[in-house]
Curated annotation (Swiss-Prot):
The gene is G6PD2. It holds the Pfam family G6PD_C. Catalyzes the rate-limiting step of the oxidative pentose-phosphate pathway, which represents a route for the dissimilation of carbohydrates besides glycolysis. The main function of this enzyme is to provide reducing power (NADPH) and pentose phosphates for fatty acid and nucleic acid synthesis which are involved in membrane synthesis and cell division. This is Glucose-6-phosphate 1-dehydrogenase 2, chloroplastic. Residues 1-59 form a transit peptide. NADP(+) 1 binds at residues 116-123, 150, 253. One of its GO terms (biological process) is pentose-phosphate shunt, oxidative branch. It comes from the Eukaryota. NCBIfam families: zwf. Expressed in roots, leaves, stems, buds, flowers and siliques. SUPFAM superfamilies: Glyceraldehyde-3-phosphate dehydrogenase-like, C-terminal domain, NAD(P)-binding Rossmann-fold domains. The keyword Plastid applies.
Amino acid sequence: MAALSSSVTTRSYHSGYLASFSPVNGDRHRSLSFLSASPQGLNPLDLCVRFQRKSGRASVFMQDGAIVTNSNSSESKTSLKGLKDEVLSALSQEAAKVGVESDGQSQSTVSITVVGASGDLAKKKIFPALFALYYEGCLPEHFTIFGYSRSKMTDVELRNMVSKTLTCRIDKRANCGEKMEEFLKRCFYHSGQYDSQEHFTELDKKLKEHEAGRISNRLFYLSIPPNIFVDAVKCASTSASSVNGWTRVIVEKPFGRDSETSAALTKSLKQYLEEDQIFRIDHYLGKELVENLSVLRFSNLIFEPLWSRQYIRNVQFIFSEDFGTEGRGGYFDNYGIIRDIMQNHLLQILALFAMETPVSLDAEDIRNEKVKVLRSMRPIRVEDVVIGQYKSHTKGGVTYPAYTDDKTVPKGSLTPTFAAAALFIDNARWDGVPFLMKAGKALHTRSAEIRVQFRHVPGNLYNRNTGSDLDQATNELVIRVQPDEAIYLKINNKVPGLGMRLDRSNLNLLYSARYSKEIPDAYERLLLDAIEGERRLFIRSDELDAAWSLFTPLLKEIEEKKRIPEYYPYGSRGPVGAHYLAAKHKVQWGDVSIDQ
């Protein structure tokens, strides 16, 4: 008999139920729909009837998975009518038992456990994001947050630690301090080892105390090193998972180092979790402008017809940080910039950009189209990749360290802190269009942007008649993900006057100027999606496999041949080789032009 998963949604119910009764045909399951009367109106209530052929018995399950009634179908000449009567009787008894909830409040609770609560990610991102969701009223009415890590700490000490990183998005917002106090009262702590069944069992007992008999939905956020993912998942799954609600686990990158280790990690996780319980987080997919990418394309007629090789000459995905590893070199040296940024953040954005129109906005439909893009990509040639590493540089009397000056980095390390690559998609829409990626640390600025450079105007009338620069007859769409989120389109126009001189101007949508509301942090969106079961912005296992299949051969060749990176000064625009790579494909990096 197939297992029946409990629904995410639960509702309070009253004693007057039947407004409609509609069986749905099926061998083993039939869905029954009722309307439950409440002071707020009529609410739909879905039940599932499960028939057991061998015994002839039928069980009716509530939305929360609880059995309402068991009956023998042979005992009733009209089994559906008999079941209906039994269900109504059982629901009336249940309503009397639970008590009428005239306010319609949910009888479920969400328990969020941050595993690795004493780490930087938890302190700087996860707890502040959870507080922001609470402040905006986005968390369920009944929720509890537990920090879990090896550090010895009390509830009060956790709250003191967390309180230092909490802020309201806009200063002096009403009731900010009061909201913080309310939020911190919902935060608790349990110390334990990540591989201890006993410690997770103790956590389970504490969670149950706070859940107070409600349907328990549990979310575990693994903010821990990848080498202990599986141990923590095993313990959480076997000793602290929900017995009557859902259990979900958010896994932070890196998801392995290559195809082999990624597949092994996925296989190990699936020993204890189903695929739909695993939420692989890439926080860049939660950024506002990345989310707006699909809206921009699919809801504006002026863009969608141009979204192909016929009009687009190249696409650039640019990521830069103006700081180095600075103490995190030990972690970074094991992965490098290609694994850290390109294989996940930039490749995920590329897949969203290049995908075909999905059937719907459903998570599976979108992820299906992204996988098709990744599987259509041409293997990356090592000749189409430039790697670099920042070196020491003195500017304004200040000396900035080289990557290998970091005490946590092995001397003589060849790990790249910069990479540029040209990628191609072998399908009808994008054949021949170079997709350029560039990512680096210790560069001249901090930014992340998508640049779409359109083809030259055919015939270039103004170049022929006035001698204007050829590039003045092209357009560029820029989506600035960070900082100062914006979308702008570069167009050509005539400079006022008697002559015929062209100028480039921007049609600019600067978010801070257009919208008074501050943009939510990416972690807020992703945490809320995980709580609500929305998987659109999380990475499916076949997406991950396709991404690693693309980059693993390149990484092996670079590392096995010990390719020496091109050195560039701290605070510069990166190695010169990146410009030669772009020129090779008849492209100029958009972020180096005068007007940018």
